[in-house]
Regions:
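Alpha-helical bilayer-embedded segments of polytopic membrane proteins, i.e.
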Residues: 46-91, 166-181, 206-253
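Low-complexity, highly charged intrinsically disordered N-terminal segments
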Residues: 2-62
Length: 304
């Protein structure tokens, strides 16, 4: 009979618990900052996101144009780099932030957080569920926030150790290279299907929009553009493949830096009992890590 193992949760010695009064005051301060930011939104912000959108469109067009001359190695390298840059920008600085509703106030359909569809095999609806709701509501709560290792990686000592994790340095490499595919199937909860906690019929129903999006993305990058490239079909195909790989490596790296560094904390489900807004704010801080770099770095990382 397996005895339950008591988990000791790491508490960063740099942090201290706040009193209820301090938490209430803390929440009011952050709410005030939020309101000040909302009140300050205006034309400069609209111009910024439109410039980002234009940069993505132009870099994608130029990258694909260069790949049409991809038999010439410098053209292939430049085209692949531009296309990879475009995909990174679209996912990180445009798609991620737009889907958080940051630009809903513009009332521009292109930047509507509920309808925006991004350039990756995963559906935006699934991302809004797994990331916007589940991850940001239950940040770093063990057993709820799937971002803690995505069910594949052991990132904290609070996670139960299994012998298979010895292979983690090996299988994390293909996971990194194929990261968009992991994001695409995250909300399908395949593990629950295998353990009979979700019916096959429910799984197949949820799989339909995923398959549709995957088919659309594969057709665009690996059928349509290679076909219209004619003699340059092969360099266009490989350029798209490498550009997607570059995007996967970058997004994997940035996302794993955000919540899984040595000072970040993991929390038990019990913290949700009577959790106030101040507690929630504090959990976001204690479970997250800062990223610092150049302005270009912050743009490419979506200002996380």
């Amino acid at each position: 009979m397996n005895m339950p193992v008591k988990v000791e949760y790491f508490k960063n010695p740099k942090n201290r618990d706040l009193t209820p009064a301090e938490l209430e005051a803390f929440a009011k301060e952050l709410d005030q900052i939020k309101q000040e930011v909302l009140d300050d939104l205006g034309e400069k912000d609209a111009k910024y996101i439109r410039r980002v959108y234009a940069a993505i469109r132009y870099s994608s067009f130029l990258g694909r144009a260069c790949l049409f001359a991809g038999w010439f190695p410098p053209a292939w390298i430049l085209g692949t780099g531009l296309l990879g840059f475009s995909k990174i920008m679209e996912n990180m600085e445009l798609g991620h932030n737009v889907m958080h509703g940051q630009y809903d106030w513009m009332n521009d359909p292109k930047f509507n957080g509920q309808t925006y569809e991004w350039d990756t095999v995963g559906t935006s609806d699934n991302w809004r569920q797994t990331h916007n709701y589940k991850h940001h509501t239950y940040t770093n709560i063990k057993g709820i926030d799937d971002d803690i290792g995505y069910g594949l990686l052991r990132l904290f000592p609070e996670q139960r150790w299994k012998p298979g994790f010895l292979l983690q340095p090996i299988y994390s490499i293909p996971f990194c290279l194929l990261f968009q595919w992991g994001v695409a199937i995250q909300n399908l909860e395949i593990g629950r299907v295998l353990y009979k906690r979700k019916t096959k019929a429910q799984f197949l129903e949820e799989l339909k929009p995923v398959n549709k999006k995957i088919g659309k993305q594969l057709f665009k990058d690996y059928v349509f553009f290679p076909l219209i490239a004619g003699p340059a079909a092969l360099p266009v195909f490989t350029g798209n493949l490498v550009a997607n790989g570059l995007r996967n490596i970058w997004t994997f790296s940035i996302i794993f830096c955000g919540h899984f560094t040595k000072d970040a904390e993991v929390f038990p489900k019990s913290v949700l009992q009577e959790e106030s807004r101040g507690h929630w704010y504090m959990r976001q801080i204690r479970g997250s890590s800062n990223l610092t770099g150049s302005e270009a770095f912050h743009i490419l990382s979506g200002h996380l």
